[in-house]
Amino acid sequence: METDQDMHDQAMAGEETDLDEKYPNRPQNKAPTLPFHDLYETLFRPLREIKKKPVGPAGNRRKAGPHGLSAANLNPIERRRDIIERFISRWRKEVGDDIYPAFRLILPDKDRDRAMYGMKEKIIGKMLVNIMKIDKNSEDGFNLLNWKLPGQSATSSMAGDFAGRCYDVVSKRPMRTEFGNMLIEEVNEKLDQLSSASKEEEQLPILAEFYRRMNPEELAWLIRIILRQMKLGATERTFFDVWHPDAENLYSISSSLRRVCWELHDPNIRLDAEDRGVSLMQCFQPQLAQFQMQSLDRMIARMRPTEDDPVFWIEEKLDGERMQLHMVSDASAPGGRRFRFWSRKAKDYTYLYGNGIYDEAGSLTRHLKDAFADGVDNLILDGEMITWNTEQDAPEPFGTLKTAALSEQRNPFRQGIHPLFRVFDILYLNGRDLTRYTLRDRRNALQKVIKPVHRRFEVHSYEEATTKAEVEASLRKAVAEASEGLVLKNPRSPYRLNERHDDWMKVKPEYMTEFGESLDLVVIGGYYGSGHRGGKLSSFLCGLRVDEGQSSQGSNPTKCYSFCKVGGGFTAADYANIRHHTDGKWVEWNPKKPPTTYIELAGGDSQYERPDMWIKPEDSVVICVKAASVSVSDQFRIGLTLRFPRFKRLRMDKDWKSALSVQEFLDLKSHAEQEHREKEFNVENFRKKRVKKTTKKPLAIAGYDENAEVQYAGPSGHIFDGLNFFILTDSNAPVKKSKAELENLVKANGGRIFQTNDAVPDTICIADRRTVKAASLQKKGDIDIIRPSWILDCIKQSEIDAGLPDLLLPLEPGHMFFMTKDKEEIVAGSLDQFNDSYARDITVEELRNLLDQMAKDGKTDSFCSPEAIQKVTEHIQEKVDSGWTMPCGWLFKGLVLCFPENENDSASEGPEPKQSQRIHLAQNTAKFAGASVTTSLKDTSITHVVVDPDFTSSELPKLRRTLSTRRKLPHIVKVNWIEDSWKENTLLDEEQHMPVYMRRYPNIQLMKV
């Protein structure tokens, strides 16, 4: 009788035979693959430690010898590449030319040949509890199953890092303390089995084998591979570039890691010209639209219009899933055609949309029998798969797409929702690659080969335009129809594979100025944050009170429908205030017994946007929220939600009974949309290049609380993960900390404490005084001794950079109690010629001294080129759009602040008045944080007028007369709006910072932007 292992071995043998036939020249390794522990020892860990190891950047002081730079003098990018090159060179020498087994583990998110595991953190945590026979209610059981929550001990206090939690728990009960005995190839085989297992009971013994054969660190890395969350600090482009000069190009046209490894195993053999284009039945990486820029004028300029051809195209941005369709004529296939569908992430959706005309499981291809012109043998189309509601003859939100496809599979004759493929590009036709042709030529070809099928398979329309006014008109229409926005396209451009380029540019309504009303919503749920906000409720689920007419008979009168999540705009004081009024009233959400008496979520049993904690409406608070727009969403109970909601203030004058109801919201929405159609839209300065500053007055330091003590608040993080410390003394400066306090700070931030310098390798010695032990270490002369100020600076900088990757500060001369000769040049390289740190945010006093020294030296550095600044700006914006925290230097980005000149100031003599100095400080802060600053009220782009506290009602008429001709008037705020927003690192509500008399007499309040 055949066992499961026998069947698996037979399947593997059959797969190998198929691969040999498909890749007859694939490389063969000459030796077994490296042990799995070598992978993390020589690659994973060194790459992660680049951002951990406290060494200075190379900067502009690097000195190269006759053989180039030493490893210690390489900058982080060069060191990262050096590590990858060494690993690949070793693989080629010791194993062979087939690096595919290693790349599958290094870049698991790019491996399309291995199916998804169907295992997220919760399932893995439950399995580990089972495997290690831990009580789920014990401390370790709780920490594994509730990994986002703060741990119950100092070592497990960090929330939000699941693999770290697993390491913490497994290291207490490891099956192995030495390296495991699994080879990379064995790990791949077991992962293949894991991905093919369909049930948890089939996956459990496989994970148990990993636990038995790996040490805790190996298992933690394996879990990162399973979750496809490596976070190595190096992208696939870096690995591809080191592997072969054509690797990135081949991946762009094939999305196949296997092809990159097997077809490009020899770096000296380049791809042929005919192999550099898209191919039938090979998934490519599509072109993406660039993010919105400073202004419509600038975006239009990026379309590169010419005198002879000034036209650009405007397309509606569709709310669906990017999809590519490959079709080839095949006489052996029923209906004579074969189809393949892939998403932008290279997921194969052929099973959902169909592989042939008569595929009964196909929700789309069954309608494509007559969709192509005669003579079309094969093609590749690029487009968007959307959900279409036949009853409403309108699109549905993106989240309903898979439901629509499955519904169409089950019953193709029912009315309701179904997939609609909107095609906007053709890249391949009858054996010819069209990517090098212009968009206009490709569109002409598309129109000739496609025969649209109504509401099933259509060519996406576009409008030709030459002016900004035409774009603005299309934007009005887009918002009125609740569209995703617009895409501007250059019709003279080629198709750029795997590239986000200015030839296509997004214009989205949510980037416009405020939309609609401020809403008073009741808080009904809370979500724990991750990273620096881990262990605390950092965002809230808000609901709409159910009206009597909408509630079912006998239902709870306090019931609320889920409406939106709010996480922006809160200050530390706001969080504290909410905690104060709701303390002891929060209840953990139980998915098996949801509190449907009080709260109703969307999705039925799926419980969309399920909070971590919930609270009864009568026990909760009401918050005032504003947002960019209202959008359709099936993730919330009423089918609508807010785009980019932002907290304004806590409404302690209201309770749940006076919070917004469902019907009141629908009435407000209808009224706001009617007004919105009549207004002109202003596109915010979304990607504004920083303006060069010319200082006319002596530079003042932008710091509003210069006397505040430097103290550590809330020690918790990962900044010292993997580091070992020996702390010899207490800290004397910049603040006094005892030895025990320093040790607790280190442990709370991931470090380990030892009481000798030689207990473990690479121990960091910390001292601020010349004790007997410190003097003994110094006398040896081979150990660096670092001052405690470096620990405090690292923690402080980590808090400032919350949301960014944890990076240890490079050591500076001031951090060194004693250093060895070979460290002197490296440490000196962490400062520039003015002794300004390359990595650390310096204090006000340090900045003042530095500026004084610069003035004495009379030296200035040249500015970066505008092109370089723009490139860096766009790179940062991509990171922000993908979920990173907005840098403090962009807090006021896109705003134009006017500081009107006071006539009395210009006539006065003597020292600068205190209030004028305060305004000047605010101007510096605003400029530093990305705002454009002007003193002229004639500037039509002004978004805020900033006045000092002495601004009186007698000055208002003149100000209003100056601004009265504008269709949209700016906010008028006191200078402390800038000060308070900067301190809280979030844009605060303008209404709370208007001059006092304007709040007292609301009839004179100016219209908002």
Swiss-Prot record:
**Which principal EC class is assigned to this enzyme?**
ligase
Q: Where in the cell is it found?
A: Nucleus
Quote one Gene Ontology molecular function term.
metal ion binding
Write out the GO cellular component annotations.
chromatin; DNA ligase IV complex; nucleolus
Query: Per UniProt, which keywords does this protein have?
Result: ATP-binding, DNA damage, DNA recombination, DNA repair, Ligase, Magnesium, Metal-binding, Nucleotide-binding, Nucleus, Repeat
What highest taxon heads this organism's lineage?
Eukaryota
List of residues binding Mg(2+) 2:
E484
Instruction: Tell me which residues make up the BRCT domain.
Output: 715-808, 887-995
Q: Which residues bind ATP?
A: E315, K317, L318, R322, E384, F424, E484, K489, K506, K508
Which residues make up the binding site for Mg(2+) 1? E384
Q: What is its main location?
A: nucleus
Cofactor(s) needed by this chain? Mg(2+)
The record, for InterPro entries, names: Adenylation_DNA_ligase_IV, BRCT_dom, BRCT_dom_sf, DNA_ligase_ATP-dep, DNA_ligase_ATP-dep_C, DNA_ligase_ATP-dep_cent, DNA_ligase_ATP-dep_CS, DNA_ligase_ATP-dep_N
Reaction catalyzed: ATP + (deoxyribonucleotide)n-3'-hydroxyl + 5'-phospho-(deoxyribonucleotide)m = (deoxyribonucleotide)n+m + AMP + diphosphate
In this chain, composition skew of type Basic residues spans 51-65
Region feature Disordered, mapped onto this chain:
1-34, 51-72
Protein family per UniProt = Belongs to the ATP-dependent DNA ligase family.
**What NCBIfam families has UniProt attached to this entry?**
dnl1
Function recorded in the entry:
DNA ligase involved in DNA non-homologous end joining (NHEJ); required for double-strand break (DSB) repair.
Matches recorded under PANTHER family: DNA LIGASE 4
Tell me the protein's name. Answer: DNA ligase 4
* Gene (UniProt): lig4
